[in-house]
């Protein structure tokens, strides 16, 4: 059988269908959308952006570069005390300490030895009093200053034993710590107390020239009022 009749028949069918479809489109142009029956045209321009879609789920953190280190923050409040630590290791044995009791006893012993030496060399002790002299002569004020320098006072006998010790130690005239320079005729010691023990020489005190306000012990142990500016031996009295 020849193929040409079949090709003619197929072409006729296609042309008939195209014609029929064109007529149908013309009939319904006023009542329906136009359907292009021709081959596709060129693509048009892009349309406007549509509305934003719904928010998507949170994505994974990106791997950006590490930023610069920030400035140090302010000092925070002081925290609560911590738990006490464990005891430390035992230290090395220290040197032996000095017993204050022994040191004080040794010091007292040395002072006693010095006192004995002073008494033997140039002093006299009677009861709780120690009398010392340097053998120099000076005014009453000079004697007071000398004795005060050594935290002592001018020798002041309160009984015959003390009076004799001062007499023997001085060996010559010496000032006593007695005066009436504040009230004439009222002899007091250097603390202002009125003296009870007295050993005046005959006719004394006589306040010659109304200016004898100090007291000296004579070689025989008797007392005599004398000028305070006189130069006599210095005898100081220390507590023993």
Curated annotation (Swiss-Prot):
GO biological process annotation, one example: surfactant homeostasis
Location in the cell: Secreted
Signal sequence, renumbered to the chain: 1-18
Disulfide bonds: 147-236, 214-228
GO molecular function: D-mannose binding
Gene3D superfamilies, A to Z: Mannose-Binding Protein A, subunit A
Residue list for modification Hydroxyproline: 46, 72, 81, 87
One Pfam family per UniProt: Collagen
Residues annotated as domain Collagen-like: 39-61, 67-97
InterPro entries membership: C-type_lectin-like, C-type_lectin-like/link_sf, C-type_lectin_CS, Ca-dependent_lectin, Collagen, CTDL_fold
Domain C-type lectin: 126-237
Tissue: Expressed in liver. Weakly expressed in kidney and testis.
Cellular component GO terms held in the UniProt record: collagen trimer; extracellular space; multivesicular body
Coiled-coil residue spans: 104-122
Domain of life: Eukaryota
Keywords: Calcium, Coiled coil, Collagen, Complement activation lectin pathway, Complement pathway, Disulfide bond, Hydroxylation, Immunity, Innate immunity, Lectin, Mannose-binding, Repeat, Secreted, Signal
Region entry Disordered, spans: 48-102
Bias-annotated ranges (Basic and acidic residues): 49-60
Known partners and oligomeric status: Interacts with MASP1 and MASP2. Interacts with MEP1A and MEP1B and may inhibit their catalytic activity. Forms oligomeric complexes of 2 or 3 homotrimers.
Protein function: Calcium-dependent lectin involved in innate immune defense. Binds mannose, fucose and N-acetylglucosamine on different microorganisms and activates the lectin complement pathway. Binds to late apoptotic cells, as well as to apoptotic blebs and to necrotic cells, but not to early apoptotic cells, facilitating their uptake by macrophages. According to some authors, it only binds mannose.
Domain remark text: The coiled-coil domain mediates trimerization.
Annotated protein name in UniProt: Mannose-binding protein C
UniProt lineage: Eukaryota, Metazoa, Chordata, Craniata, Vertebrata
